[in-house]
Amino acid sequence: MDHKPLLQERPPAYNLEAGQGDYACGAPGYGAIPSAPPPPPYPYLVTGIPTPHPRVYSIHSRTVTRYPANSIVVVGGCPVCRVGVLEDCFTFLGIFLAIILFPFGFICCFALRKRRCPNCGATFT
């Protein structure tokens, strides 16, 4: 395979002055979008008696509850030690019923679970 350059001629120079290239611009304004005419004046309604506006009453009641800025709420936090996060654990009876009564036993298993704090060891049903 020959390693010849693909381009035999040099590219044209880029120092063309304005209006000398192939795409010279025509007269100024040629091809420009014409400006839009001014909009027509609004029609005025002339009536002898002004129409009364309906009365609008707006009654707003807003209840604002402010919480202290320093409180941090932990969902699932232990109410005894306030440090640990409660974990779900299944009772022996719940696991036994899940095995014996297979499809419906899972309902018993989830109904008989305990929540336990790993920090203080407190259990909640």
Curated annotation (Swiss-Prot):
GO MF terms, alphabetically ordered: identical protein binding
CC annotations in GO: lysosomal membrane; perinuclear region of cytoplasm
Keyword Membrane: yes
Segments passing through the bilayer: 67-86, 92-112
Domain of life: Eukaryota
InterPro entries per UniProt: BRI3 (IPR019317)
Membrane topology term: Multi-pass membrane protein
Keywords in alphabetical order: Cytoplasm, Lysosome, Membrane, Transmembrane, Transmembrane helix
Keyword Plastid: no
Subcellular location as annotated: Lysosome membrane; Cytoplasm, Perinuclear region
Main location: membrane
Subunit comment: Interacts with BRI3BP. Interacts with MGAT1 and IFITM3.
Family: Belongs to the BRI3 family.
Entry function: Participates in tumor necrosis factor-alpha (TNF)-induced cell death. May be a target of Wnt/beta-catenin signaling in the liver.
Name listed for the protein in its UniProt record: Membrane protein BRI3
Annotated source species: Cavia porcellus
